[in-house]
């Protein structure tokens, strides 16, 4: 049996770790991805199942591996300026991690090569994934199963597009001052809300708004000054 995972972002790597860790060794599993497609460099926040999957699948130990992954501990979520602001912790003894998305492939893929003889990596930009009935073709190469984790599709023609998305625009801002809080930050603001993800050397901020209410120029004038202000208020 042959399985392919297309894409080496968080979804693709999470998927292939789970497949390799749970499926028998006779199942050959390929990771197909392009080094010319880069992740969004803002950092990513996870729930408690993600460090557990890394631990089971690639022997991740936060105490020893956090620097290589640029990761920090996450004990929950903190809300500010919402109707019911406050800290919502994970269950006792549980934690997630916040990590550098650019470092995740560099950390995971070498360990997959070392730990799983049925793992292969193919570097290429996939042009076509096509169902053949009982098999699937990836640019002419046949697999029994293919999991497409490439992210945003190029063609939305077979999607149902809703007009009920209240926050339809966003920008990300990287602060080179690392956050010293152990949670993901969620701040309501006059145009929508924003998140803050503390990493070891930087902090990633995402600023979200509704384009029908707020212009792009108006929205872009706020995040930098807003993040500097909020970064000093995190422990209030």
Identify the residue ranges that each predicted region occupies.
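Short beta-strand to alpha-helix junction loop
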Residues: 92-110
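Single conserved hydrophobic/aromatic residue that forms the stacking wall/gate
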Residues: 228-236
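A structural signal for isolated positions on well-ordered beta-strands in alpha/beta enzyme cores
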Residues: 4, 28-30, 206
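N-terminal Rossmann-like FAD-binding beta1-loop-alpha1 element of flavoenzymes
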Residues: 3-24
């Amino acid at each position: 049996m042959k399985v392919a995972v297309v894409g080496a972002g968080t979804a693709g790597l999470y998927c292939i770790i789970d497949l390799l860790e749970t499926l028998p060794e006779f199942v050959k599993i390929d990771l197909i991805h392009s080094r010319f497609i880069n992740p969004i460099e803002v950092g990513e926040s996870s729930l408690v199942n993600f460090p557990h999957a890394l631990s089971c699948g690639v022997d991740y130990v936060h105490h020893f591996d956090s620097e290589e992954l640029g990761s920090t501990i996450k004990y929950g979520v903190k809300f500010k300026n919402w109707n019911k602001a406050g800290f919502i912790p994970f269950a006792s003894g549980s934690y997630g991690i916040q990590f550098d998305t650019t470092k995740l492939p560099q950390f995971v893929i070498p360990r997959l090569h070392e730990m799983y003889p049925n793992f292969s990596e193919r570097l290429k930009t996939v042009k076509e994934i096509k169902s053949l009935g009982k098999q699937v073709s990836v640019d002419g190469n046949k697999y029994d199963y293919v999991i497409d984790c490439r992210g945003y599709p190029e063609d939305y023609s077979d999607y149902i597009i809703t007009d009920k998305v209240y926050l339809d625009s966003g920008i990300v801002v990287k602060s080179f001052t690392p956050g010293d809080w152990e949670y993901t930050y969620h701040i309501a603001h006059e145009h929508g809300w924003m998140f803050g993800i503390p990493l070891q050397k930087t902090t990633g901020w995402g600023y979200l708004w509704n384009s029908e209410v707020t212009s792009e120029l108006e929205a872009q004038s706020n995040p930098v000054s807003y993040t500097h202000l909020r970064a000093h208020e995190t422990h209030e």
